[in-house]
Amino acid sequence: MELLKATVLFTITAVVEIVGCYLPWLVIKQNKPLWLLLPAALSLALFAWLLTLHPSAAGRTYAAYGGIYIAVALAWLHWVDGVSLTRWDVAGATVAMVGMLIIMLQPASA
């Protein structure tokens, strides 16, 4: 259950972080309206707060979160940007997720 809760929290955190970075990219690269910077800043503040909700040490949290972030970023690439994923994208995300699971499932006494 803890793994499921952490995975859901990591996924929400990743989406919020990506939104916070994607909106300024739209402003800079695609000349979208400047007001998009306000929800971007709010999104990044929410991202920082969400990271504090994770129960393990900060460094371990960030390391495990990285695996989820990679998978969510590739999902964003596919669903939002409309880019087809390659087998290399899928393989890389799989390796990252395995790494996340190794970190998250380590024994408490390790």
Swiss-Prot record:
Protein's UniProt keywords contain Cell inner membrane: yes
Coiled coil regions, renumbered to chain: none
Transmembrane segments: 8-28, 33-53, 63-83, 90-110
An annotated GO cellular component: plasma membrane
Keywords, ordered alphabetically: Cell inner membrane, Cell membrane, Membrane, Transmembrane, Transmembrane helix
Compartment(s): Cell inner membrane
Chief place where the protein resides: membrane
NCBIfam families: PRK02237.1
Family: Belongs to the UPF0060 family.
Name of this chain's protein: UPF0060 membrane protein Veis_0342
Source organism: Verminephrobacter eiseniae (strain EF01-2)
